[in-house]
Amino acid sequence: MYIIICLDDNNGLAFNHRRQSQDRIVVEDISKTVGEKKLWITDYSRKLFQAVSNLEISENPKEEAKKGEYVFQELETLDTDDEQIEQFIIYRWNRVYPADVSVEIGVEWKLTETEEFPGFSHEKITKEIYCRESNGENSFGCFLSGGRVSNT
C-alpha cells in the first residue's frame, strides 16, 4: 500500500484530534496521483475528497488496503516498519503548526523524488516520495512520473 500524509516542518501530522491544515490543490494532486486505484480514507477525511469517485471509507483503512492501493492518513501516527507499506507520499506544508501527533520516517526509507508547487492556501507545497531501501538498494523501484507514482 502507498501511504499519503501531510506534514509540517517538524513532521507534525495532527493536533487535538484534528488535521493541522488542508489545501484543495493538495487534494487535487492526490486525486491525480491515485488515478483509478482505490483511495482508502476514514470518514473524517470524506469531506476533503467529495469529488473523488474511487474512495473506500473505513475506520481502519491501513488494515483494509491491499498492495498497490492508497491510504490517506490524517490523525494517527504510523509504524514505518510495517512491511505492507510500499511507499510514502508526503505533502509538506512548509510551515510549523501545533502538533501532538507526529511521524518519523525511518532510515530504511529513501527520498527518491521531490516536487514543489503552489498551493491554494499555502505559498509552497512540497511533495516527497519515499521508497523502502533493502541492503542499500531501492527494493520497489518507485519513481514519480508526470504527477503519478509508478513502480518499475
Model-identified regions with their sequence ranges:
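Enzymes that bind and transform nitrogen-containing heteroaromatic metabolites
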Residues: 1-152
